[in-house]
Amino acid sequence: MIGKLKGIVDSYGEDFVILDVNGVGYVVHCSARTLQRLPKPGEATDLAIETHVREDMIRLYGFRVDAEREWFRLLQTVQGVGTRVALGVLSVLEPAQLATAIATGDKGAVARAPGVGPRLAARLVAELKDKAPAFAPIDPALIALTGAVEDRTAPQPVADAISALVNLGYAQIQASAAIAAALKGLGEEAGTVEAKTLIRLGLRELAR
């Protein structure tokens, strides 16, 4: 079994990278998010590998961090989730974002993944909710903020800022996480901050 590959990026396909390791080109399937973050052809990189062996083929899946590989495995424990859907989920949500989305019951964030409808998103959240904290620490402030937004008890500037980021195309969990980080950075000033300032700070968090 192959657990890690280190080599030179040869070329890219729609959902894979060919990694040249000592003259041998390995086809490694990756999430869209991982492919976007790999270097250009001719540069070195390394990937954690999940190897799937079947009677007629051996397929390699690559990940930049071990947490992504662990989520890839965990997602497939849910009925209806195969490798393609698991990579789709990891294409729209980083491991920490996925853990938070599941822990907070944000089915909408999970449903943004290709191949994941509302019913499958609900099943993923329900079956993995108790396991999510073991894969990434969940920020209590983010959970509280998410609950306040859902209950419509969040301060208006906070709700407006999150809504603005969602309207810009970000997932609800991404917007909430960015605003939660911005509020934490503001400290005592968080109680008087305006929505436009939160939006600017939230976009800065999302750009990191």
Curated annotation (Swiss-Prot):
Region Domain III, residue ranges: 153-208
Free-text function comment from the UniProt entry: The RuvA-RuvB-RuvC complex processes Holliday junction (HJ) DNA during genetic recombination and DNA repair, while the RuvA-RuvB complex plays an important role in the rescue of blocked DNA replication forks via replication fork reversal (RFR). RuvA specifically binds to HJ cruciform DNA, conferring on it an open structure. The RuvB hexamer acts as an ATP-dependent pump, pulling dsDNA into and through the RuvAB complex. HJ branch migration allows RuvC to scan DNA until it finds its consensus sequence, where it cleaves and resolves the cruciform DNA.
- Annotated source species: Methylorubrum extorquens (strain PA1) (Methylobacterium extorquens)
Question: MF terms per GO, please?
Answer: ATP binding; four-way junction DNA binding; four-way junction helicase activity
What does the similarity note say? Belongs to the RuvA family.
- Pfam families in the record: HHH_5, RuvA_C, RuvA_N
| Name of this chain's protein | Holliday junction branch migration complex subunit RuvA
Keywords, ordered alphabetically:
Cytoplasm, DNA damage, DNA recombination, DNA repair, DNA-binding
According to the record, the residues making up region (Domain II) are: 65-143
Keyword hit for Protease: no
Q: What is known of its domains?
A: Has three domains with a flexible linker between the domains II and III and assumes an 'L' shape. Domain III is highly mobile and contacts RuvB.
